[in-house]
Amino acid sequence: MSADSSDAAHPSGLARVPDFLRLTRLDRPIGTWLLMWPTLWALWLAAEGIPERGTLLIFVIGVYVMRAAGCVVNDYADRHFDGHVKRTRDRPLATGRITEKEAKVLFAGLVIIAFGLVCLTNLPTVLLSFAALALAATYPFMKRYTHFPQVVLGAAFSWGIPMAFMAIQRQVPLEAWLLLAANVAWTVAYDTEYAMVDRDDDLKVGIKSTAVLFGRADRLMIGLLQALTLLLLAWVGLRLALGGFFWLGLAAMGAIFVFQHRLIRHRERDHCFRAFLNNHWAGLVVFAGIALSLWPML
């Protein structure tokens, strides 16, 4: 191989920025939004309206940082598998454009930033953050040992909920745990849609997922999980006496779920991926319903 072709395969300097953006998924924000929406639900509900600006900023930045950290550790865990999966074979760690050492240093740096942010809240929230770190660090390895890595991901994507309540109210009431359970169910549903994209490749390399476990019952299980999500969110709405806008948002989420089932009915890869991406709007409409229900002028 010539020196020129080697340099093209392994760029240096600023030419490496796109690889680090891909590693942290900053070029594909869907995962960040799926983590952001339930965190915003919790912040608004805990504050009974618009949260204090500093707290909001801490959690918004924290979502970006921890999502990036989670992607780094995910690709590190999958570095020997990604090359065998069509969708992931060009990831920077799988191709060697980013080294394992660089990934470890980046992960540590992102965790330090996140810890610095949470230290601006209060001690109970700081203590809760250790569970968030444990979930983020262990999730990527679960797919080797269990068919339920999506449940661990759901817990990781939901842990901002009790942290938000603790930061604002210094307690984690029942409503927070119901919201967490709803978000876990929703996460397992949409990540099963995501896993349906890779199911054939995962079966070849021995990766486990709910999509592999559910098999031909995948659409039924996704529907049941989505129904559970709606029921748990409705329970939260009833307990907190949320107004009509919340129920409109919940109805819109239900309509979005119906649309997703039209997309995945033939289990085509592209359509399953579109259904996964569509969950951004599901989170948005629920947030809009909560925010408008708690808006003081409405």
From Swiss-Prot:
One of its GO terms (cellular component) is plasma membrane. It catalyses: all-trans-octaprenyl diphosphate + 4-hydroxybenzoate = 4-hydroxy-3-(all-trans-octaprenyl)benzoate + diphosphate. It is an enzyme of class 2 (transferase). Its main location: membrane. Its cofactor is Mg(2+). PANTHER family: 4-HYDROXYBENZOATE POLYPRENYLTRANSFERASE, MITOCHONDRIAL, PRENYLTRANSFERASES. NCBIfam families: ubiA_proteo. This is 4-hydroxybenzoate octaprenyltransferase.
